[in-house]
């Protein structure tokens, strides 16, 4: 099984991979199996590097987890054996029971996290777009100021509201989109664009969905969490 992750900050030099075992939505409620780092990632804007994390569980129960930065081919991995910190049968049964017991609460947490990631991804994507000289130079000064103010306001709110509800994050994203979409559409139309989407490099104006943020979603296998 493979999954693509990315960086969380501009020019992030590496990622810290944490491998968890468990059925819960959040890694804090799961069992940490091991960690490893993937370093020397070339400087790039947040979300640009493509890091493929692959899980391989063999017939003997030995788990191999590898991470590869697709642009450079830089790789690292960890091997986790049955005798290295794995849960016992009783512990696994308890965690499965807990997952069933807290299923509704976990779903609310997971939905809120996905909405938070959606807002964060959209805001940073718009920030990168407005910072692009190819775009910035085509915006009217008043529009550029309005975009920067709306983006900065959304990011400041995010920093102060890390545990808001799904509805609050979705409301904030709609507010941001209500400022960004008309301005970007007007700019595109002034360049002679028609239907069929925005120019390359511009974010989807319909809003971005929940991204591959840390611990996004529950799964039946180990989880990967990235940090700065």
Curated annotation (Swiss-Prot):
Which GO molecular function entries does the Swiss-Prot or TrEMBL record give? ATP binding; ATP-dependent protein folding chaperone
Q: Which Pfam families match?
A: HSP70
Which UniProt keyword terms apply here?
ATP-binding, Nucleotide-binding, Stress response
* Top-level taxon in the UniProt lineage: Eukaryota
Name the segments for region: Disordered. Answer: 191-228
InterPro entries linked to this entry? HSP70_C_sf, HSP70_peptide-bd_sf, Hsp_70_fam
Gly residues bias spans:
191-200
What family does the entry list?
Belongs to the heat shock protein 70 family.
Q: Which PANTHER family match?
A: HEAT SHOCK PROTEIN 70KDA
Q: What is this protein called?
A: Heat shock 70 kDa protein
Species of the source: Leishmania braziliensis
